[in-house]
Amino acid sequence: MDIIETAKLEEHLENQPSDPTNTYTRPTEPVEEENKNGNGKPKSLSSGLRKGTKKYPDYIQIAMPTESRNKFPLEWWKTGIAFIYAVFNLVLTTVMITVVHERVPPKELSPPLPDKFFDYIDRVKWAFSVSEINGIILVGLWITQWLFLRYKSIVGRRFCFIIGTLYLYRCITMYVTTLPVPGMHFQCAPKLNGDSQAKVQRILRLISGGGLSITGSHILCGDFLFSGHTVTLTLTYLFIKEYSPRHFWWYHLICWLLSAAGIICILVAHEHYTVDVIIAYYITTRLFWWYHSMANEKNLKVSLQTNFLSRAWWFPIFYFFEKNVQGSIPCCFSWPLSWPPGCFKSSCKKYSRVQKIGEDNEKST
């Protein structure tokens, strides 16, 4: 009886029609047809995966998501434009100082204006040298820190744009209003009275000496509103703190002390009116905070009716520099120069996962 039942079962299975829903058949549709139907592989598949699928047709192609674009593109060419902008305004400042110097009234005819700080604090001769030395130290620390930043191109263009804009403001303020010297100790260079060649020599002397008194290049008067030394001391500290790790509190404290002491020494030396320092500090900090708030917040990069920051005259320049930067820049450091150079690095053959598994299967068979 068992033999008869087995024979009937086999006969029943042979006569039963095959159900296509219970089997899997690999589609034989060509790749061109798949691409037309929208089922083809995306263009972003790596070349290794394409080669692997051709060599091993038994593997099923899986569409991988495309890589997101770089959130922090370097764009060094934009940094170059910002650098030219900063250099132009710095040179323009020296030209403006030379022009304004000819309009400064003699201290015998126009004595220094009253200043409350000067009323209570007597002048200390060496204080201004301390201020300039502190500024040189802060600039040196900032340049060294900037060289080791991973995204130095983005940070560099921000620094160049901000300092260039600040010195552009300084050119305007010193030109529209000429203040008398803050103290009777000032020894201003003689006026040239239209000697263009001598003015060019003074401009070159200012540029070569960095406009510092300790280098003997700061011999002109009239650049009192607002203080360029305060701009440098404040801005370098702000950038040092912003683009360094938060747990470097000791580093931030040292830089803050250098900046604060330098600003106080400007007033102690009676080289600038108190209002010069206050205005310089206010404009520098506002411009730095406004720019970085707009750069770090995506909604502030759009010119909207409710975004009042976008009404600044420099917003189109800001958008040009920052439109491709997505979010806040992470505090990352790297060596300024990669070693060994790319031409000395040995090229290694890269395998995709499909190729590696396929070759392992061939070896096992």
Curated annotation (Swiss-Prot):
Organism per entry: Macaca fascicularis
Coiled-coil spans in chain: none
Pathway: Sphingolipid metabolism
Chemical reaction(s) catalysed: an N-acylsphing-4-enine + a 1,2-diacyl-sn-glycero-3-phosphocholine = a sphingomyelin + a 1,2-diacyl-sn-glycerol; an N-acylsphinganine + a 1,2-diacyl-sn-glycero-3-phosphocholine = an N-acylsphinganine-1-phosphocholine + a 1,2-diacyl-sn-glycerol; an N-acyl-(4R)-4-hydroxysphinganine + a 1,2-diacyl-sn-glycero-3-phosphocholine = an N-acyl-(4R)-4-hydroxysphinganine-phosphocholine + a 1,2-diacyl-sn-glycerol; an N-acylsphing-4-enine + a 1,2-diacyl-sn-glycero-3-phosphoethanolamine = an N-acylsphing-4-enine 1-phosphoethanolamine + a 1,2-diacyl-sn-glycerol
Region ranges (Disordered): 1-52
GO cellular component: endoplasmic reticulum membrane; Golgi membrane; plasma membrane
Biased composition (Polar residues): 15-26
Transmembrane segments: 80-100, 128-148, 159-179, 218-240, 248-268, 273-290
PTM: Palmitoylated on Cys-331, Cys-332, Cys-343 and Cys-348; which plays an important role in plasma membrane localization.
Lipid addition sites, S-palmitoyl cysteine: 331-332, 343, 348
Family: Belongs to the sphingomyelin synthase family.
PANTHER family listed in its UniProt record: PHOSPHATIDYLCHOLINE:CERAMIDE CHOLINEPHOSPHOTRANSFERASE 2, SPHINGOMYELIN SYNTHETASE
Any one biological process term the GO annotation gives: regulation of bone mineralization
Chief subcellular location: membrane
Keywords carried by this UniProt record: Cell membrane, Golgi apparatus, Kinase, Lipid metabolism, Lipoprotein, Membrane, Palmitate, Sphingolipid metabolism, Transferase, Transmembrane, Transmembrane helix
Subcellular location: Cell membrane; Golgi apparatus membrane
Function: Sphingomyelin synthase that primarily contributes to sphingomyelin synthesis and homeostasis at the plasma membrane. Catalyzes the reversible transfer of phosphocholine moiety in sphingomyelin biosynthesis: in the forward reaction transfers phosphocholine head group of phosphatidylcholine (PC) on to ceramide (CER) to form ceramide phosphocholine (sphingomyelin, SM) and diacylglycerol (DAG) as by-product, and in the reverse reaction transfers phosphocholine from SM to DAG to form PC and CER. The direction of the reaction appears to depend on the levels of CER and DAG in the plasma membrane.
Assigned EC number: 2.7.8.27
GO MF term set: ceramide cholinephosphotransferase activity; kinase activity; sphingomyelin synthase activity
Protein name: Phosphatidylcholine:ceramide cholinephosphotransferase 2
Basic and acidic residues: bias regions: 1-14
Ranges facing Cytoplasmic side: 291-365
